[in-house]
Amino acid sequence: MDALPIQEQTGKTYASRRAGLMHACGHDGHTASLLGAARMIAQLKASGACEHWYGRLNLIFQPAEENGQDGGGAMAMVNDALFERFPCDQIFGMHNAPTLPLGRVHLRPGAMMASSDRVDVLITGKGGHAAFPHSTIDPTVAAASVVMALQSIVSRNVDPFGNAVISIGRLLAGEHGTHNVIPQQARLELSVRALDPKTRDLLEQRIRELIKLQSESFGCTASVNYRRGYPVLVNHPASSSLVEQVARECFGEDMVDGQTPPIGGSEDFASMLEVRPGCYFLMGNGDGPGSCMVHHPGYDFNDDLLPASIRMWTALAQKLLELR
């Protein structure tokens, strides 16, 4: 459903056969979980156990979350009239969490995961010989100043109780081996994250202003390509309460955290939650020896999570359809 450009190093017999591609985030396991729930619900229906269930249940298998741009697979499905073709009163999504004990459920109402935007910056000066900097307009110095100034946005423009991140992933100026050349241009690549839509807007405004003015103060010009990615993921309070209730009934009080701290990572399911109420939750993939974070060449979805995730999906469907 959604592989990553990573060479798998798990040593499993079922490891990826495609060189340089692997399921490094567990989306194959998520697919198996939902298929397992579909099978369980079909068996319950055949046995007559669903006679008090009312309504229609839509199972959404959404690809391309790892795309990271243009709203990912979620926005593509929304734009393709997903909810007009398959109406939904509420929607729910789940992701495994390698840092949590196996089967433990974490969620929170409100903002749970950050927005994610990408920024490409090109600073242009006037290149020349390194021995004569006075005859140049050095874009490297301007870029270095921009890097430092960007850090003031979070510390001086964002509410201290808010959450925001501006990370510089790349700074490139000049070519290898050109020690005596002041380059014509410098490039920056940024990752920008926020847990509030207003903060997200503020970050874009200040980043654009600061880069322009800071570059001009050195005599350079700057172009900013600001690409909005996934929005803030906001869980609906009533849907979150329902997920928490079902999880506690399935696994017990000590296996549920209904007020988990917000996460700086991003998820395109947020685009679906902008048009339909619902809840996105995490289930522990296990934190024992050998476990590792997603997007790692040694990552493996823990198949021992399948029974718990299938049970969670089935119980949630039952609760929703009985409530109708």
Predicted features along the sequence, with ranges:
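Active-site metal-binding loops of divalent metal-dependent hydrolases
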Residues: 1, 96, 285-286
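Enzymes and membrane/adaptor proteins characterized by extended Gly/Ser/Thr/Asp/Glu-rich
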Residues: 8-13, 295-298
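Metal-dependent amide/peptide-bond hydrolase catalytic core
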Residues: 141-324
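Cytochrome P450 catalytic-core helices
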Residues: 31-36
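Short acidic-aromatic active-site loops that bind/stabilize oxyanions
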Residues: 23-24, 303
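Generic structural motif recognizing short loop/turn segments at the entrances and edges of beta-strands
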Residues: 2, 103-105, 220, 297
